[in-house]
């Protein structure tokens, strides 16, 4: 399963790290490997292991049918709202730890997710990386 992370600060880099360190246990849980295909950020990260995954245009993620899960870790209402709304409209599951976004636009984004039959999840980011865990669990059918 392909995923994308929007924002590569403390929480975004933590999400990438959690998937890297715990990739095999997460794969067992969801029934397939979870791979970060893109990391959206304004900055470049020369020498960082994710440098080849950096994109600067959120539409690259929204328009890629392989990406099923998007983790928003940018913070603030804008541009997070515009980006998250585009992901939901594109039929992607989204999770965020962005309290400002959820407080101001949560009801609208929940309704859009329901309309598009995808999940919009929000939870506290206790230790960078936690926001992706529930989404992976919920977005995949139970494996026996």
PLM-predicted stretches and their roles:
Residues 6, 72-74, 97, 104, ...:
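Structural motif
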Residues 134-144:
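Residue-level detector of conserved catalytic or cofactor/ligand-binding positions
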Residues 1-89:
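N-terminal glycine-/serine-/threonine-rich beta1-alpha1-beta2 phosphate-ribose binding loop
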């Amino acid at each position: 399963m392909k995923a994308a992370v929007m924002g590569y600060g403390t929480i975004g880099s933590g999400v990438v790290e959690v998937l890297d360190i715990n990739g095999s246990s997460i794969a067992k849980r969801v029934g397939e490997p979870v791979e970060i295909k893109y990391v959206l950020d304004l900055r470049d990260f020369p020498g960082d292991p994710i440098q080849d995954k950096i994109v600067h245009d959120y539409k690259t993620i929204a328009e890629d049918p392989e990406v099923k899960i998007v983790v928003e870790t940018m913070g603030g209402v804008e541009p997070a709202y515009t980006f998250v709304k585009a992901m939901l409209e594109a039929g992607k599951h989204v999770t965020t730890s962005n309290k400002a976004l959820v407080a101001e636009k949560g009801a609208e984004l929940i309704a859009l997710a329901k309309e598009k039959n995808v999940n919009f999840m929000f939870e506290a980011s206790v230790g960078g990386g936690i926001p992706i865990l529930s989404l992976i669990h919920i977005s995949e059918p139970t494996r026996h």
